[in-house]
Amino acid sequence: MATALSEEELDNEDYYSLLNVRREASSEELKAAYRRLCMLYHPDKHRDPELKSQAERLFNLVHQAYEVLSDPQTRAIYDIYGKRGLEMEGWEVVERRRTPAEIREEFERLQREREERRLQQRTNPKGTISVGVDATDLFDRYDEEYEDVSGSSFPQIEINKMHISQSIEAPLTATDTAILSGSLSTQNGNGGGSINFALRRVTSAKGWGELEFGAGDLQGPLFGLKLFRNLTPRCFVTTNCALQFSSRGIRPGLTTVLARNLDKNTVGYLQWRWGIQSAMNTSIVRDTKTSHFTVALQLGIPHSFALISYQHKFQDDDQTRVKGSLKAGFFGTVVEYGAERKISRHSVLGAAVSIGVPQGVSLKVKLNRASQTYFFPIHLTDQLLPSAVFYATMGPLVVYFAMHRLIIKPYLRAQKEKELEKQRESAATDVLQKKQEAESAVRLMQESVRRIIEAEESRMGLIIVNAWYGKFVNDKSRKSEKVKVIDVTVPLQCLVKDSKLILTEASKAGLPGFYDPCVGEEKNLKVLYQFRGVLHQVMVLDSEALRIPKQSHRIDTDG
């Protein structure tokens, strides 16, 4: 199966693989590997001008790898950020003998400085589109009572409300951000809109403030002030003051939230709202890798309620989540359950069924696409009908699995193949260069390999008969796929020492004489070797460690 191709796959040399050492290798192991490769690639050992030039290039690459890994600071940078981290401007002013954590902080600081140069080009658009659908005619029919009324025999499904909101952010400086937002709403033929402008300033690492001005056709001007402050490392407070101007006068409002981390996964909130819909609310939220739990209690005018909800997070590639909640108060009782799942890299689709008294039964469908949200609340019935609950539950499941199998999955597969092919084309030049370097390395190894084979044959030791690296197709259903393997017999024989061959847990593409023949796809290494005059065979994954010879690799010829 093809895998996504990362930029690191193309641009970063794997220095550990090049030296064939573990990522935890000691300085002695690094030095031994460096000396062995220096003896192989030193330019002075080759008289032919072309071979001498190739040896010089490979020798410099090996020397660069050793220089990086033998220095604790550059090795820490390379381990965390790869080769690109070493190329980041500003490391020359960093003190030596820093810990990996300090180096990580320094790298992030340098990244922030680079990002500040592009602040003016940044924006953070967010949008919501909500479309309310009245589908009660599907279940609440009055045919028997109104038989004389002429009309269509088909249920009447209509859109009874809509809401659209959009906001963008424009960073002015490293601490100031302007926010412009607007919204439009309509319900049963009546609508209105508003526009808001806010200016946010980060005053320190502990807090920020925001001024907001707004106006709309249904409500008068709005003036607001928001403040955020970290009181302690585990406690923060937010305050929102608002003044709503209208023909009836000024309506003030104040909302204050005090929050405290009870432990690393649990936060407690205490909220007081005065003025517009006064209320006191307290809640506890626990969020872990596999679950999200909320319990809340609100006392207020006009709504008082108790809420408990739970969400389970599955640890799969699609980030599936199932949730359920119970909410009871003076307005009635509502039970809600649903699920959501990632359908593409930037899209999450979810559906929930809401069953309540006196609200009835509703189906809520939500699609999150990047920073855009599309919400469709569908009101099915005002009564508690089992048929409505059944169709609201099973309908979305049937539609989802049908769409996923017939539309989404084939589309994503085609997109993935298209992206992979595009990446292969862009990497073609790099692959050609790697191939030429590998062929040059193999030519430089010939004399050393001849001596190694003579030594191994004299003591009935380890002889690499054949070795292949790349994509192997064994499944009959995939025979049409092209086999992409390269012969790596010589490079592996060159790594044999004292009748042993040891490869570390790293991609074999970085080994001397190797290159990646199928960028972005799964690869294996297959080795046929002879030890003590007996044939052995083994196949390992690209990033799997290998030690030979082993008795388990022996080819049984008795049968």
From Swiss-Prot:
A Gene Ontology BP annotation from the UniProt entry: cristae formation
Membrane topology type: Peripheral membrane protein
Residue spans crossing the bilayer: none
Domain J: 14-82
Coiled coil: 417-457
SMART domains registered for this protein in UniProt: DnaJ
Any one GO cellular component localisation term in the record: MICOS complex
Highest taxon of the lineage: Eukaryota
Protein keywords: Acetylation, Chaperone, Coiled coil, Membrane, Mitochondrion, Mitochondrion outer membrane, Phosphoprotein
The keyword Chloroplast is annotated on this UniProt entry: no
CDD domains tied to this protein: DnaJ
Subunit-level organization: Associates with the mitochondrial contact site and cristae organizing system (MICOS) complex, composed of at least MICOS10/MIC10, CHCHD3/MIC19, CHCHD6/MIC25, APOOL/MIC27, IMMT/MIC60, APOO/MIC23/MIC26 and QIL1/MIC13. This complex was also known under the names MINOS or MitOS complex. The MICOS complex associates with mitochondrial outer membrane proteins SAMM50, MTX1 and MTX2 (together described as components of the mitochondrial outer membrane sorting assembly machinery (SAM) complex) and DNAJC11, mitochondrial inner membrane protein TMEM11 and with HSPA9.
Family under the similarity heading: Belongs to the DNAJC11 family.
Entry protein name: DnaJ homolog subfamily C member 11
Organism: Pongo abelii (Sumatran orangutan)
Lineage: Eukaryota, Metazoa, Chordata, Craniata, Vertebrata
